[in-house]
Design a protein with these regions (language model features):
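Amphipathic, hydrophobic N-terminal targeting peptides for secretion and organelle import
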Residues: 1-45
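Short beta-strand edge/turn micro-motifs at domain boundaries
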Residues: 2, 30-42, 163-193
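Short, charged low-complexity linear motifs
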Residues: 10, 89-94, 167-168
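Short low-complexity stretches enriched in small and charged residues
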Residues: 20-26, 47, 89, 103-110, ...
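Phosphate-binding glycine-rich loops and adjacent basic patches that engage nucleotide phosphates
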Residues: 23-34, 48-57, 133-135, 169
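Core segments of small alpha/beta cavity-forming domains
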Residues: 43-123
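Surface-exposed, charged secondary-structure patches
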Residues: 112-160
Length: 193
């Protein structure tokens, strides 16, 4: 092979250096453009990015927190019809198979739409929620029909015009065959009892 000597060698070396510098600037500009085009997601969109098939909530408390955040979004956030449907499907994934069998998705979704309309028509807004402590949840575990179950209390803060009230619900969760905690049912707690 012949070597380039003299002017030809210098010109080729200069071309390679310029191509390398150009490629470097091309890549660095591209990275800056990608960083600038990050999209600000809404609370609903961030929630819908969760893939429960790959990363299911690990504890009863986390299941109720996710369900409650979805519920808060139903009554307090802006979303499209498609996002509403996707949130409903996500909350339905948290249901135990027995609850899902007694309340098919179409019935659940129709009831949810009515509830949302009622809350919006009457200007109710869910502003916050808190759940039982992990220790209380651990102490509430019990066995039923061969399943491990537990109770989780959730306290919802609701605003109606200038009034603020707290609603307490008790959730019963059951560990399924895959080891996932699923919502078996829930009920309002009568504060007078």
């Amino acid at each position: 092979m012949r070597r380039f000597k003299g002017a030809k060698g210098i010109v080729l070396l200069l071309i390679f250096v310029l191509v390398g510098i150009g490629f470097y600037y091309y890549l660095s500009d591209r990275i800056e453009i990608e960083q600038e085009t990050e999209i600000d997601l809404t609370v609903v969109q961030e929630l819908l990015l969760k893939d429960l098939d790959k990363k299911y909530p690990p504890s009863p408390k986390e299941v109720v927190k996710l369900y409650s955040e979805l519920t808060r979004c139903f009554y307090a956030e802006e979303y499209s019809e498609e996002e509403l449907y996707d949130m409903a499907q996500m909350s339905y994934q948290l249901f135990d198979k027995d609850l899902a069998n007694h309340n098919p998705f179409d019935n659940y979704y129709a009831g949810l739409l009515k509830d949302i309309a009622y809350y919006k028509d009457n200007s109710y807004i869910m502003t916050a929620y808190t759940t039982s402590s992990s220790v209380d949840i651990e102490n509430a575990k019990f066995e039923k029909d061969g399943y491990t179950c537990t109770k989780v209390y959730c306290y919802y803060t609701m605003r109606y015009a200038t009034q603020i009230t707290t609603i307490t619900e008790v959730f019963v969760l059951r560990k399924d065959e895959s080891g996932y905690w699923k919502i078996y049912g829930w009920d309002l707690v009568d504060e007078n009892e």
